UniProtKB/Swiss-Prot annotation:
PSII is composed of 1 copy each of membrane proteins PsbA, PsbB, PsbC, PsbD, PsbE, PsbF, PsbH, PsbI, PsbJ, PsbK, PsbL, PsbM, PsbT, PsbY, PsbZ, Psb30/Ycf12, at least 3 peripheral proteins of the oxygen-evolving complex and a large number of cofactors. It forms dimeric complexes. It is found in: Plastid, Chloroplast thylakoid membrane. This is Photosystem II reaction center protein T. It is a single-pass membrane protein. Its main location: plastid. GO terms for cellular component: chloroplast thylakoid membrane; photosystem II reaction center. Keywords: Chloroplast, Membrane, Photosynthesis, Photosystem II, Plastid, Thylakoid, Transmembrane, Transmembrane helix. Found at the monomer-monomer interface of the photosystem II (PS II) dimer, plays a role in assembly and dimerization of PSII. PSII is a light-driven water plastoquinone oxidoreductase, using light energy to abstract electrons from H(2)O, generating a proton gradient subsequently used for ATP formation. SUPFAM superfamilies: Photosystem II reaction center protein T, PsbT (SSF161029). The chain crosses the membrane at residues 3-23. The gene is psbT. Pfam families: PsbT.
């Protein structure tokens, strides 16, 4: 069970870092052109 907890913590940490960078530097590509 500990492995599952460590995996969850790792994924959550990477997610927080990803969103922090994503919101700090908004994509320059308009979202309307992506679709």
């Amino acid at each position: 069970m500990e492995a599952l907890v460590y995996t969850f913590l790792l994924v959550s940490t990477l997610g927080i870092i990803f969103f922090a960078i994503f919101f700090r530097e908004p994509p320059k590509v308009p979202t309307k052109k992506m679709k």
